[in-house]
Amino acid sequence: MSVDKKWVIFDLDGTLANIETRRKIAKKPDGKMDWEIFFADKLIEHDEPNEPVIKMAQALKASGYNIAILSGRSKSSKQVTAEWLKKHGVEYNILKMRPTSHPWKFMPDEELKLGWFNDLFAGDENRDEHEVVCVFDDRQKVVDMWREIGLTCMQVAPGDF
């Protein structure tokens, strides 16, 4: 199989982007997360790059692999997200972000990403020629899902949330 049919999937928050500062700012006094603050564009644009993971994405892209970024982040942040990825030198073929409409808005990340994965090559008459080589993610539930469907998943950080 030629490398042009090979894909690597990356998560965004906690994987390509270090979100610790944003997480601290958005944490309420009771310890719960204020998701409106957490996903505010003005905070997203200041995320620090997770350099080792970004270097992997760059090396894989330079070697001819296709890059798909599947993020639970809202589609309403697509512009600031695309600008952040460009600023940090992350090239990609596909960027999927959570739709703002129901039922997608509240769907667990592992269900959302499995749905996207199942539709990734839909409509391509050569669908069976594509291969997902591996996945980079941080969230345990999502990592477990990738592994359950038989994909190799590189867990880049602890993600029990």
PLM feature spans:
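Short, aromatic/basic amphipathic alpha-helical patches
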Residues: 81-89, 120, 144-150
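Short, surface-exposed, polar/charged, turn-prone segments marking secondary-structure boundaries
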Residues: 95-98, 127, 161
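Alpha-helical substrate-recognition element adjacent to the catalytic core
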Residues: 2-103
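Conserved Lys-Pro-Asp/Glu-containing loop-to-beta segment of HAD-superfamily phosphomonoesterases
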Residues: 4, 113-140
